[in-house]
């Protein structure tokens, strides 16, 4: 980056923030939808520990009357295995998951848009590929 124009430096800094956010939010989704085999650990770790995640926050913000049990389970850590499994199943079936995926795609698209004024060189192509990888990864 040394010697790069200030506009390029700013674009890359902003890109890093956006793609980093998209990566973390995708990780939130993966923790809900993935399997032990793919993750190498039990899914729903954040849910078990009561850590706020994008799918959970979206579910709380868009809770419907029939989501009472999910809202209750999202309000605390789920150390009980049965409650954890129930919470995970409810969250997997909730429309918040679709909205969360859409938001991650928006963040990755916003990151990609920051690259448009950069030179068309292999590094830019690699960063654009990173945008795709962030939204398609499963573990």
Segments from the language model and where they lie:
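All-alpha prenyltransferase/terpene-synthase fold signal
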Residues: 1-139
């Amino acid at each position: 980056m040394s010697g790069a124009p200030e506009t390029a430096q700013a674009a890359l800094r902003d890109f890093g923030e956006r793609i980093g956010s998209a990566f973390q939010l995708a990780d939130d989704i993966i923790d809900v939808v993935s399997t032990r085999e793919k993750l190498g650990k039990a899914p729903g770790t954040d849910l078990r520990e009561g850590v706020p995640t994008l799918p959970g926050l979206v579910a709380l913000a868009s809770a419907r009357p029939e989501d009472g049990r999910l809202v209750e389970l999202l309000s605390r850590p789920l150390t009980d295995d049965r409650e954890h499994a129930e919470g995970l199943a409810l969250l997997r079936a909730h429309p918040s998951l679709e909205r969360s995926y859409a938001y991650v795609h928006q963040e990755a698209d916003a990151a990609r848009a920051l690259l448009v004024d950069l030179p068309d060189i292999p590094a830019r192509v690699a960063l654009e590929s990173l945008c795709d990888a962030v939204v398609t990864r499963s573990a």
